[in-house]
C-alpha cells in the first residue's frame, strides 16, 4: 500500500499541474480580450480561448474576471510562434505569450537543443498542419453512424473512432454550430477545441520518444509557452 506522503505528493503534483494549465488559459483569455475586445462573438480568438479554458475546467467566474480585467492589465504580452524539427523529421510548433521575447526564445532554443532538434524558418512547418475544430465525444450515447446521420448536413471534415471515443473534425468556422448540435443531442463531450491537426503522423524509436517527452514537459512547465504540438503518432 502506498504511503500517505507519497499519495499526498502525487495529489499536490496534479494540483500544481492543473493550476499551471489554468494560469495559461487565463493568460490567453486576457491577451485575446485585450487585443480584440471583450465580446467573444466579435473576437474569434477570445472565443477559442474561452472554449479551451472551459475544456480545462476553468470556472466561468474566472473567465469573466480575466476578460473584464484585460483592459486594466499593464503587461504588454506578445504572441510568438516558433516552428522547428526534431528527430526523424518530427514537426514541432510552439506558441508562446510573453512580455520578454529574448527570455522566451532563449528558453525555446535550449529545449530544441536538448531534443537534438532545430528551429526552422516561419511557415516551413505549419504547412504540415491544418487548423480544425476537434470534438471528442463518448461512444456510449450514440454510435458513429448515428452521429454521422445527425451531422450529415454539416461541413464535416472527418469522423473517426476508437473503442471509447468518436473524433469529429470540422472547419473552424463551423465549430460552434457543430458543438451546439452535439449538445442538443445529449453528446457526452470529452474535449472541444480548435487546434492544429497534422496532415500525417510519424513514429519515433524509444530514445527519441524519451527526448520528446522531456521537450514537451519542459514546454508545459514554461509559463511563457501556451502550447506545443507535434506530428508524433502517439499522444504524450
Swiss-Prot record:
Similarity comment: family membership: Belongs to the TACO1 family.
Keyword line: Cytoplasm, DNA-binding, Transcription, Transcription regulation
Lineage: Bacteria, Bacillati, Mycoplasmatota, Mycoplasmoidales, Mycoplasmoidaceae
Gene3D superfamilies for this protein: 1.10.10.200, 3.30.70.980
One term under GO cellular component: cytosol
The protein's name in its UniProt record: Probable transcriptional regulatory protein UU295
GO MF annotation terms: DNA binding
InterPro entries, alphabetized: Integrase-like_N, TACO1_YebC-like_2nd/3rd_dom, TACO1_YebC_N, Transcrip_reg_TACO1-like, Transcrip_reg_TACO1-like_dom3, YebC-like
Alphabetical list of Pfam families matching this protein: TACO1_YebC_N (PF20772), Transcrip_reg (PF01709)
